[in-house]
Regions:
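Loop-to-transmembrane helix boundary motifs in multi-pass membrane proteins
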Residues: 12-30, 227-234, 287, 309-319, ...
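Extracellular/periplasmic helix-exit of transmembrane alpha-helices
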Residues: 147-176, 230-293, 333, 378-391
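Helix-loop-helix module between adjacent transmembrane segments
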Residues: 1, 5-78, 86-105, 195-200, ...
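Hydrophobic, membrane-embedded alpha-helices of multi-pass small-molecule transporters
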Residues: 102-119, 145-153, 176-216, 224-226, ...
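Selective recognition of specific alpha-helical transmembrane segments in multi-pass small-molecule
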Residues: 25, 30-34, 84-85, 89, ...
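Flexible loop linkers connecting adjacent transmembrane helices
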Residues: 1-17, 210-220, 224, 250-265, ...
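C-terminal membrane-solvent junction of multi-pass transporters and transport-like membrane proteins
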Residues: 47-54, 64-85, 101-102, 131-132, ...
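Hydrophobic alpha-helical segments and their helix-loop junctions in multi-pass secondary transporters
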Residues: 65-70, 74, 84-107, 115-117, ...
């Protein structure tokens, strides 16, 4: 059961659309791999205990897969045994952090994504995703419990900040011209900042090509697909609202609660003399510190203020664990999808040169190319001088890659939604006003993300280091060309269907 969104595009827009879609997906997945390799490497550098747990977590997932699929152990028993081992691994990792450089982690993660993409899905991907579900529910459950215990606190974050902010938000390096200008307008550049699974082209590829094939019944698609998006929306809302609502201004939170907020942050590595608001922290630190502060503020009402710092440090680490677990999920899944897209792109070659086709589409060859290209983009740290202070600042690759990845991902979502709109027209035969329920948001999303990527290409890309101009800049340019080609095919097909 189930076909990929690329196959659906062929059915409603023609064979050319399928190959254009496949090429777009493949290039987009390169940016996904590069961005998440960089993010994961930075998380492991800043939280070495998360690195240790992740290193242990993978063999445990392999162990679970072997128990269930090779030795026939019941899932409930295998789950119980593996979860106990994971809990033991958590305590072990707290005492034995793994210290490696950012560059070393980038190489290790690239090799991991290569290995995971080539292995059978039951061997690592499926068991690890299954075990991650327990971590997700624990993460969300703690967040929900926290929101209940802190509902009486006054909101810290402002309802409105600014419609336009510095170009640094969308990847401009400190000291460059776009970083000094308020050119990052909320519309249309918000999809270059927020790359959430609640609106994600990457997820459309996973859902249509992988998840759909695992459904027992087509009727389950509504519960699994729509239910997953509702859950993802809830998670994204908690991730954004809870830390900002509770911990926007550190001094204000300390004054309102009487808790040692500033001391806790200092012990967690935050320079509170310079960083007074959570928005001033980097993306990863914003997430981990915000989650830690929110949970510590809530649980200190149960365990007392004396435990505040320990609770904060513990749940800051827990947030890093959760983040790294889902980043690794993205890495191996993205590379596996890139491998499939690569193979499908060359299926026309099978009848013309079978030997060449076999070499190009070999599972290990197809699994190696994307992480190698991603590693080239993710590997370097860029050292820049902040003009205002003269301080030397090391900028991780994801700061520059994230807007490019985010934009291509959201544009893929728009293209998938437009393909879905044509499917509604062709297959379901839906006409009239109700058809605009899918067509209107798809067109608005396409216009928004296309405009945002053009802005990034014009205003940000020329000021990036040469590597990112040649790498991310070229990928975005190619993606926009493919985007225009697909929208032309969409218009042509839509006219035929009307």
């Amino acid at each position: 059961g189930g076909v990929s969104i690329m196959t659906v595009s062929e059915n409603v827009m023609g064979r050319r659309a399928r190959y254009i879609f496949l090429a777009y997906v493949w290039f987009a997945l390169i940016l996904v791999l590069a961005a998440f390799t960089s993010v994961a490497s930075s998380v492991f550098v800043s939280t070495p205990t998360a690195a240790t747990l992740s290193l242990i977590y993978m063999p445990l997932a392999l162990f679970f897969g072997l128990l269930v699929y090779r030795f026939g152990v019941r899932i409930s028993y295998a789950t119980l045994v593996t979860l106990v081992l994971i809990i033991l691994a958590i305590f072990y990792s707290l005492n034995y952090p793994t210290y490696l450089t950012y560059e070393a982690w980038a190489v290790i993660l690239a090799f991991y994504s290569f290995l995971a993409a080539g292995l059978p899905v039951w061997y690592l991907l499926q068991p690890r995703d299954y075990l991650n579900a327990y971590l997700l529910w624990a993460f969300v459950g703690v967040a929900l419990f926290t929101s209940v215990l802190t509902f009486d606190l006054a909101l810290q974050g402002p309802i409105y900040t600014k419609f336009a902010v510095s170009g640094a938000v969308i990847g401009a390096l400190p000291g460059t011209t776009p970083a000094k200008m308020d050119i990052a307008y909320f519309w249309p550049v918000v999809p270059l900042v927020i790359a959430c699974g609640a609106l994600s082209g990457f997820h459309s590829v996973v859902a249509s090509g992988t998840t759909s094939k695992q459904l027992a019944n087509e009727l389950d698609a509504l519960f699994v697909g729509f239910g997953a998006m509702l859950t993802e929306g809830a998670v994204s809302s908690l991730a954004v609202i809870l830390p900002i609502a509770v911990a926007w201004n550190f001094a204000s939170l300390q004054a309102a609660t009487g808790l040692p907020v500033l001391e806790a942050l200092s012990k967690g590595g935050v320079d509170v003399s310079k960083m007074t608001e959570i928005i001033q922290l980097g993306a990863v630190d914003r997430f981990t510190n915000g989650y830690g502060l929110a949970v510590a503020t809530a649980l200190s009402r149960i365990f007392g203020p004396s435990q505040y710092i320990d609770i904060f440090l513990g749940f800051k680490t827990f947030a890093a664990w959760a983040l790294s677990a889902f980043i690794l999920t993205t890495l191996d899944t993205a590379n596996r999808l890139a491998r499939f897209a690569w193979r499908e792109m060359f299926d026309w070659l099978e009848d013309r040169s079978r030997t060449t086709y076999k070499i190009l589409t070999n599972r290990w060859v197809a699994s190696a190319i994307p992480p190698i290209l991603a590693l080239i983009l993710a590997y370097p740290k860029i050292d820049v001088i902040v003009p205002e202070t003269g301080a030397k600042l090391s900028v991780y690759a994801y700061s520059m890659l994230w807007p490019a990845f985010s934009g291509t991902n959201q544009l893929l979502a728009a293209l998938a939604l437009l393909t879905g709109a044509l499917w509604v027209y062709f297959v379901l035969g839906v006409r009239g006003r109700i058809s605009w329920l899918i067509l209107a948001p798809a067109l608005f999303l396409w216009l928004t993300v296309t405009a945002a990527l053009v802005m990034w290409l014009v205003f940000i890309m020329p000021y990036l280091p040469v590597l990112y101009q040649a790498g991310a800049g070229t990928i975005i340019a190619i993606s926009l060309i493919l985007d225009i080609m697909l929208i032309m095919l969409f218009v042509k097909a839509f006219r035929k269907s009307v």
